[in-house]
A protein has these predicted regions:
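Short acidic, glycine/proline-enriched helix-loop-strand junctions
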Residues: 432-455
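Short, solvent-exposed amphipathic alpha-helical segments in soluble enzyme
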Residues: 25-27, 170-172, 197-200, 227-228, ...
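Proline-aspartate-enriched helix->loop->beta-strand connector
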Residues: 413, 417-423
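Generic long, charged, amphipathic alpha-helical segments
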Residues: 380-412
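Short, surface-exposed amphipathic charged segments that create phosphate/polyanion-binding patches used
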Residues: 150-155, 287-295, 409-412, 458-469
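Hard-cation-handling environments
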Residues: 228-367, 424
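A general structural motif
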Residues: 221-225, 305-316, 334-337, 375-378, ...
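His/Asp/Glu-rich metal-coordinating catalytic cores
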Residues: 2-66, 71, 75, 80-254, ...
Length: 469
């Protein structure tokens, strides 16, 4: 590294798809440093218990935090960081700032419950969430802000989730210019939002390194079958009971909107009961409606609630468990193991007139995965000790994924002239496959995969070297 030239050390702390945290250390030409994080999330999924996070980052050594979006695997550890002493700014889009409290409070309530049931620790308090929110700096899309006299940041719209951002970081000093684009979890479109191209000046940036997700680095868009709507139409024509597992933020609202559009088109009856269960689903649904202007929802999408909708609570749920036909349920959790879904599934699985849908990924060990993989007529044992014979039809689709497929990521890269590309957020195999494709199809040789133990040093010419630490 030439003396007097700025560079940045980039380290990813997550090998897979959860626990997102990228530490960035800017080294200026005068020897001074500025450190910022992109995201600070919890580890989730099989083998984790909702209390794991990267605890190797010291709050006193971080100068600012940039948040790409409000999924707990990206923002869930922020109150822990604040509790440990972080007292500086947390930048995010204004749409993310409008909803971030819902997920953090839900995480806190789950921790309180698990503290009693499983004797697990409570890692932060309600006051820590309140303090975290006080430190938020809400930024509009395409608004450029200074986080240091030589560092500018611009949040750019992203279809992954309402409020999600790709984040452009520009380091500019006499010794050199470095441009960095962090995609976050990226998708080029969103049913609720008008996702516009980035400003032309962003695509034209020189000295650019892209730090991109690679969740579906081995999957192409033409490999994903779109079956859900046809299946729902067919099931409604048969007066079936339809049960959908759904994540409370984003996925549940999209399913509601798609049902509403099927109703408006006359494809399913408007009087078909639509039952929504899950506290986070209800909270996000009404927050989206209340803050639709901040969220910049498309005008036609603001009426996303289906006809004949009912929001379910603990009091009304027991009677609904006895339903045998003619109803559409949408319930958390997305993988079936938690929330009301864990109660509904054992009741509905033995119903020959039920269609049970998993509209997303189901990880190993989850209830959704178990019922998808079980054969018809197989006996399924539940955690409480009772068993049920699988008689319902169980289907799964990947069409609602909020992540770009590999071909969409390659197409996204083609709008730029990057000197180098770093990949993160994906299983190791998917990152390796996408890296090889980037090198072959785009001719970019300066590539790397972020992971524990490695720091990539980036300067005005892209990746300079990888340092093992």
């Amino acid at each position: 590294m030439s003396k007097g030239k700025p560079y940045i050390d980039i380290r990813g702390y997550h090998k897979g798809v959860t626990g997102s945290c990228i530490r960035n250390t800017v080294h200026f030409s005068d020897g001074k440093k500025f450190r910022f994080l992109v995201d600070y999330g919890m580890y989730q999924g099989e083998g984790h218990h909702g209390i794991e996070y990267n605890d190797s980052v010291s709050p006193e050594k971080i100068d600012t935090i940039l948040l790409t979006h409000t999924h707990l695997d990206h923002d869930g550890a922020l109150p822990i960081f604040v509790r440990k002493g972080y007292n500086k700014d947390i930048y995010m889009s204004d749409a993310s700032a409008a909803v971030i409290d819902i997920g953090l409070m839900d995480s806190y309530n789950i921790m309180k419950r698990d503290a009693k049931l499983k004797r697990q620790p409570i890692l932060f308090s309600e006051s820590d969430i309140e303090q975290t929110i006080k430190q938020i700096k809400a930024v509009k899309y395409e608004q450029t802000v200074k986080i240091h006299s030589n560092i500018s940041v611009t949040f750019l719209n992203n279809g992954h989730l309402i409020g999600a951002s790709a984040i452009l970081v520009q380091i500019d000093e006499p010794g050199g210019i470095i441009n960095l684009l962090y995609t976050g979890d990226y998708k080029p479109n969103n049913i609720f939002l008008d996702i516009k191209p980035f400003p032309s000046w962003v695509y034209a940036l020189p000295n650019l390194t892209i730090i991109s997700e690679a969740t579906y680095g081995s999957t192409n868009s033409w490999e994903v079958a779109h079956t859900w709507e046809d299946d729902i139409i067919e099931a409604c024509s048969r007066n079936q009971l339809i049960f959908n597992c759904a994540f409370g933020q984003g996925r549940a609202q999209e399913l509601m909107y798609r049902i509403r559009m099927l109703q408006d088109a006359g494809n399913i009856p408007k009087d078909y009961p639509v039952l929504i269960d899950g506290t986070t689903t209800v909270s996000y649904t009404f927050r989206y409606l209340d803050r639709s202007n901040i969220i910049q929802m498309k005008e036609e999408a603001k009426n996303f609630l289906p006809y004949n909708i009912q929001f379910v609570d603990n009091k009304s749920r027991p009677a609904l468990l006895e339903k045998k036909n003619r109803a559409i349920f949408i319930s958390t959790s997305g993988m079936g193991s938690h929330g009301p879904a864990a109660t509904y599934i054992p009741h509905f699985l033995s119903n020959q007139n039920a269609l049970m849908y998993i509209p997303g990924y189901a990880s190993e060990g989850t209830l959704a995965r178990k019922i998808v993989e079980a054969n018809y007529g197989e006996e399924i044992l539940f955690k409480d000790g009772h068993s049920v014979i699988k008689k319902a039809e169980v289907k799964q689709t990947g069409e609602f994924s909020s992540h770009a497929t590999a071909d969409q990521i390659i197409e996204f890269f083609q709008h730029f002239a990057p000197l180098s590309i770093l990949l993160n957020h994906g299983e190791p195999k998917n990152k390796e496959i996408l890296e090889a494709r980037v090198q072959k199809e785009l001719g970019i040789k300066k590539t790397g995969i972020l992971g524990m133990g490695y720091v990539y040093r980036v300067n005005s010419y892209g990746i300079d070297k990888a340092v093992e630490k």
